[in-house]
């Protein structure tokens, strides 16, 4: 080296001597002297301040031997990303006293050059005293980057030249919530700890799981070691560049995304980094670290004062939460409130099930039905609870050293279900663009578990007959989320839905939790193939039939009962001892093609079934409307309609009719009836008579053709057929509507017994799903587009006469009779008198 040249600093020494279990920090001694020097350097005055180190040219030895390895592909574009680490090398950044005019050299030294060298005799002998072993920290901010002006310029330029992620830190500095952890309740006052394995309980390997273990899933324990990802070293980079990189021991990741949003949660030992971004809102980030840890904020490079910590609530007994976002106090208050609530979730419990239960309830919250389209505050709350449930699940599993089989399957199933609800119901995602992945299992163990679950699904479908186990088989296929699993259970799921529909037509009320759960997962596995691409003809036919039967199961009475059941369940759930699991309260209306459940007539029906309560009428009406709107949006997948009912979205002349369908009835493989409040320009149209002119109903038979015509509905008392064995009604749909414009039912005639029942007409005193005591009109829709009016099934209004009116009428008749009798008596007395005068 020349006399005028002296080297002064190393910001990061990326050396890994075997298994290193700690992060070390070194501060350049001249750091404080160089605080103001970073303002002097500009790499590109057109785009702003950007510092980049020089790298040797590999083609120019001898310095070229220290060039970055080719696999890193370090360029001026990739250098700012700080992806400098390579396992076979250690990197050294060398700067001079001329910094920042001289940006320094980034050199790479192969580790083989450093290992096995003889000791340097000029250096003092190493001490023989072994240092006291310290446990590796769970979270370690890499302050080496903070304490070097060169790195500070790089990170600050990225945070402040590109964008300012936290323009108003005071808006994100808020007090702790009411239900977060305290000194007396370090896990939160409402926390219900997850179950722990009993002393001596056996840990079952996943390769030995059988149906008996599924029967006893709540007492079957799996060892965490080998099943979940082992904690590994990882450098977490804040996407907003608002803080410095953080060294963590990662345990997995949760990712949810679609065409309109992306959520990514990185889990670690006592760490979570959650990023939520949407097309309709600025991105937000939540970082959870141990209580004694602090994350420094990246400050303005023009500010001589060092920046403080990231904003967020004060630290708790176990964790400290930091909140990042571009929200200001002038923004929408609901967005700030939602972000504050998300920041409190990690300190409100340790049980994943409580967070999933709260997320399901949040989906049906009052503002869930307030408006259509994306709702960032609701999406933030849903995904915040979803991510926190994963954080709690992983932490509890590692802390206990074991995980319950029912908890493992429950977490995987409910998190997937909630991800779909959040994406479609709150973010406005297209249904066929949603993707979801939870990477908390060891890759090898995951493959073994999936293979075993696939085998158990096949065994359940082959051997078992109970509805509960079949529902569990569909749930396992839903967890596996693979085409082979869906194809394996699809025939059984379709048969189950047909069987439940037959019981419904026979008068059985399908209200038990196991029936709801079976319908939920059976409907899910039949609808799922369209997400993987274009469904096959068999998949489309199964899905169309399941949608038709779900619509048939969703009568007006069922819709009102569903609303009442959800209200009761939500009011009863405390998310501690009583949890709210949506599949146990699933309604076929949510998987149907009925989009009219939020209309006023249905709201009144639901309110009529409400039990006595102290809840004000206005609040009850708002809750009822919110639940109905949520059910309608849940069912209304535009992508699902395009995939399975393409004739309903067929465009003619380059444009589709701007008419919102109220009900779709896929009656054949390529034709559907649609109910609307306005006429459609194509198809065979019928105007339904006897309906309030303010809410008219139009029925249209649609195919892929663009021709349009209108017909009149033919009236018949009963269907007359020539062949008593085959009445020709199988495949038709029985539809009933009221004068108020409410479609009460659309029932599929799918068996000979059902068609015989319709041909015979209603029976006095015999209850039937085809009868009603509400004034209404009955139609029969045929697969060929013909519609007839079944007069025998109509219900005519009966005049209601008050008892007082009847008594007054009877008294009037008696008085009139008495008056007539008196007149006759007078006449009889007077007639002889007239005769005498003559």
UniProtKB/Swiss-Prot annotation:
The chain crosses the membrane at residues 804-824. Changing residue 138 to A: In strain: Nonneuroinvasive mutant HF10. It comes from the Viruses. Residues 825-838 are intravirion. Glycans are attached at residues 73, 120, 216, 332, 437, 670, 784. The keyword Membrane applies. Its main location: virion. It is found in: Virion membrane; Host cell membrane; Host endosome membrane. GO terms for biological process: fusion of virus membrane with host plasma membrane; symbiont entry into host cell. Residues 259-323 are annotated as: Interaction with gL. Residues 174-204 are annotated as: Disordered. It is a single-pass type I membrane protein. HAMAP family: HSV_GH (MF_04033). Belongs to the herpesviridae glycoprotein H family. The heterodimer glycoprotein H-glycoprotein L is required for the fusion of viral and plasma membranes leading to virus entry into the host cell. Following initial binding to host receptor, membrane fusion is mediated by the fusion machinery composed of gB and the heterodimer gH/gL. May also be involved in the fusion between the virion envelope and the outer nuclear membrane during virion morphogenesis. This is Envelope glycoprotein H. It comes from Human herpesvirus 1 (strain 17).
């Amino acid at each position: 080296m020349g006399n005028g040249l002296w080297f002064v600093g190393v910001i990061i020494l990326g050396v890994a001597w075997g298994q290193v279990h700690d992060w070390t920090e070194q501060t350049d001694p001249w750091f404080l002297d160089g605080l103001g020097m970073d303002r002097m350097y500009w790499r590109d005055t057109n785009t702003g301040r950007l510092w980049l180190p020089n790298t040797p040219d590999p083609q120019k030895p001898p310095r070229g031997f220290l060039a970055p390895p080719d696999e890193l592909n370090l360029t001026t574009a990739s250098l700012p990303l700080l992806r400098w680490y390579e396992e076979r090398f250690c990197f050294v950044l060398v700067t001079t006293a001329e910094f920042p005019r001289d940006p320094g050299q980034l050199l790479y030294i192969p580790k083989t050059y450093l290992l096995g060298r003889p000791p340097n005799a000029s250096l003092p002998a190493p001490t023989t005293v072994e240092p006291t072993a310290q446990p590796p920290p769970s979270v370690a901010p890499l302050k080496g980057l903070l304490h070097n002006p060169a790195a500070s310029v790089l990170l600050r330029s990225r945070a402040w030249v590109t964008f300012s992620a936290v323009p108003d830190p005071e808006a994100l500095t808020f007090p702790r919530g009411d239900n977060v952890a305290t000194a007396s309740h370090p896990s939160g006052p409402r926390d219900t700890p997850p179950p722990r394995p009993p002393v001596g309980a056996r840990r079952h390997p996943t390769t030995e799981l059988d149906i008996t273990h599924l029967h006893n899933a709540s007492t079957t324990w799996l060892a965490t070691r080998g099943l979940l990802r082992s904690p590994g070293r990882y450098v977490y980079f804040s996407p907003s560049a608002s803080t410095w990189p953080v060294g963590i021991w990662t345990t997995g990741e949760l990712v949810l995304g679609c065409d309109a949003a992306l959520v990514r949660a990185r889990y670690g030992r006592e760490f979570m980094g959650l990023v939520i971004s949407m097309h309709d809102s600025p991105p937000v980030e939540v970082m959870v670290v141990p209580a004694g840890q602090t994350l420094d904020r990246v400050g303005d490079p023009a500010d001589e004062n060092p920046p403080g910590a990231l904003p967020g609530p004060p630290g708790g007994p176990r964790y400290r939460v930091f909140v990042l976002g571009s929200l200001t106090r002038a923004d929408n208050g609901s967005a700030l409130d939602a972000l504050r609530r998300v920041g409190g979730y990690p300190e409100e419990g340790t049980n994943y099930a409580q967070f999933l239960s709260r997320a399901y309830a949040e989906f049906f919250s009052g503002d869930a039905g307030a408006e259509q389209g994306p709702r960032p505050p609701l999406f933030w709350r849903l995904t915040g609870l979803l991510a926190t449930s994963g954080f709690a699940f992983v932490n509890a599993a590692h802390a206990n050293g074991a995980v319950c089989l029912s908890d493992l399957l429950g977490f995987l199933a409910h998190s997937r279900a909630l991800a779909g609800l959040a994406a479609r119901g709150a973010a406005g995602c297209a249904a066929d663009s949603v993707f979801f992945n939870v990477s908390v299992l060891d890759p090898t163990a995951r493959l073994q578990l999936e293979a075993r679950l696939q085998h158990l699904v096949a065994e359940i479908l082959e051997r078992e007959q109970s509805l509960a186990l079949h529902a569990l088989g569909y749930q396992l296929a839903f967890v596996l989320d693979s085409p082979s699993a869906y194809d394996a259970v699809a025939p059984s799921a379709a048969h189950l839905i047909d069987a439940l529909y037959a019981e419904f037509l026979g008068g059985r009320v399908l209200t038990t939790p196991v029936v709801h759960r079976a319908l939920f997962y059976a409907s899910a596995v039949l609808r799922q193939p369209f997400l993987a691409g274009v469904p096959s003809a068999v998949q489309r036919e199964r899905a169309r039939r399941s949608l038709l039967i779900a619509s048939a199961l969703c009568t007006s009475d069922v819709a009102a009962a569903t609303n009442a059941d959800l209200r009761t369940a939500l009011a009863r759930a405390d998310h501690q001892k009583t949890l709210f699991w949506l599949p146990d309260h699933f309604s076929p209306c949510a998987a149907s093609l009925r989009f009219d459940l939020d209309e006023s007539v249905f709201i009144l029906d639901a309110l009529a079934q409400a039990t006595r309560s102290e809840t004000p009428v206005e609040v009850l009406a708002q809750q009822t409307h919110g639940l109905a709107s949520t059910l309608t949006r849940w069912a209304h997948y535009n992508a699902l309609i395009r995939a399975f009912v393409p004739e309903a979205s067929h465009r003619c002349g380059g444009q589709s009719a701007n008419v919102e369908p109220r009900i779709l009835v896929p009656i054949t493989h390529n034709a559907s009836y649609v109910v609307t409040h306005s006429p459609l320009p194509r198809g065979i149209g019928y105007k339904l008579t006897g309906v309030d002119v303010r809410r008219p109903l139009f029925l249209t038979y649609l195919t892929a053709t663009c021709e349009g015509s209108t017909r009149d509905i033919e009236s018949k008392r009963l269907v007359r057929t020539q062949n008593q064995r085959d009445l020709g009604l199988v495949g038709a749909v029985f539809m009933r509507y009221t004068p108020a414009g409410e479609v009460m039912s659309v029932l599929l005639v799918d068996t000979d017994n059902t068609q015989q029942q319709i041909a015979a007409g209603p029976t006095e005193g015999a209850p039937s799903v085809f009868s009603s005591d509400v004034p209404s009109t009955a139609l029969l829709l045929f697969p060929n587009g013909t519609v007839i009016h079944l007069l025998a099934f109509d219900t005519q209004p009966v005049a209601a006469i008050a008892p007082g009116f009847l008594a007054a009428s009877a008294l009037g008749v008696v008085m009139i009779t008495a008056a007539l009798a008196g007149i006759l008596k007078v006449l009889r007395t007077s007639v002889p008198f007239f005769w005498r005068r003559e």
